[in-house]
Amino acid sequence: MKRTYQPSKIRRARTHGFLVRMKTRGGRAVINARRAKGRKRLAV
């Protein structure tokens, strides 16, 4: 059986990347929450 996680840098960036987060209101909320928390990495 094939495992569910098949890593791909392109797919990772296109679905969870910074620019994708900034496109939607909810995504910007995620970035702001991570900024407020002091996360070193805001997005993938």
Swiss-Prot record:
- UniProt keyword annotations, A-Z: Ribonucleoprotein, Ribosomal protein
Among PROSITE patterns, the record links this protein to: RIBOSOMAL_L34 (PS00784)
| Gene3D superfamilies tied to this protein | 1.10.287.3980
- Specify the superkingdom: Bacteria
One GO BP on record is: translation
Q: Which family does it belong to?
A: Belongs to the bacterial ribosomal protein bL34 family.
Q: Which GO terms describe its cellular component?
A: ribonucleoprotein complex; ribosome
One GO molecular function term of this record is: structural constituent of ribosome
HAMAP family reported in the protein's UniProt record: Ribosomal_bL34
Organism name: Albidiferax ferrireducens (strain ATCC BAA-621 / DSM 15236 / T118) (Rhodoferax ferrireducens)
Q: What is this protein's name? A: Large ribosomal subunit protein bL34
- A Pfam short name: Ribosomal_L34
